[in-house]
């Protein structure tokens, strides 16, 4: 992630915010010439601040990104004081490490892989 020179936060503060809060990333993509907003669980790399998400291969999100990889994103608190991270970029779609990334985001957002939802999501990892 490239940090704007005018940003109030440095890389360390951005990583702290992203790793300490379990707020889904809101992705804005283009679908059929109209904006589509999706909330998606994510993980973040401490060194690069690269955000990794997992979505089913047949999802509208993936179909939209295959047609146009440009995204806008926001990871922000819903309550005052409002703060967060937002930006734009290009999504990179890959099937590498899908199971590992899925496991990581499930544990991050659900706390474990023991719930029915977690088992259902993990069961669809190869689809």
Placement of each model-derived feature along the sequence:
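Charged, gly/pro-rich active-site loop segments
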Residues: 1-9, 83-127
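Short, basic/aromatic recognition patches
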Residues: 2-26
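Short beta-strand segments
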Residues: 22-57, 71-75, 85-86
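Short histidine-centered beta-strand/loop micro-motifs
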Residues: 53-55, 63-64, 76, 101
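Helix-adjacent hinge/juxtasegments
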Residues: 61-88, 92
């Amino acid at each position: 992630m490239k940090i704007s020179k005018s940003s109030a936060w440095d890389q360390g503060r951005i990583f702290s915010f992203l790793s300490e809060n379990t707020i889904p990333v809101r992705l804005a993509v283009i679908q059929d010439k109209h904006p589509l907003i999706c909330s998606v669980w994510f993980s973040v790399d401490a060194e690069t601040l690269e955000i990794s998400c997992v979505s089913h291969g047949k999802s509208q999100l993936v179909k939209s990104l295959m047609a146009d990889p440009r995204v806008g994103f926001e990871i922000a608190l819903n309550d005052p004081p409002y703060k967060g991270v937002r930006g734009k970029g290009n999504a990179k779609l890959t099937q590498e490490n899908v199971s590992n990334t899925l496991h990581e985001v499930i544990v991050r957002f659900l706390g474990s892989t023991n719930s029915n939802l977690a088992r259902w999501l993990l069961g669809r990892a190869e689809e």
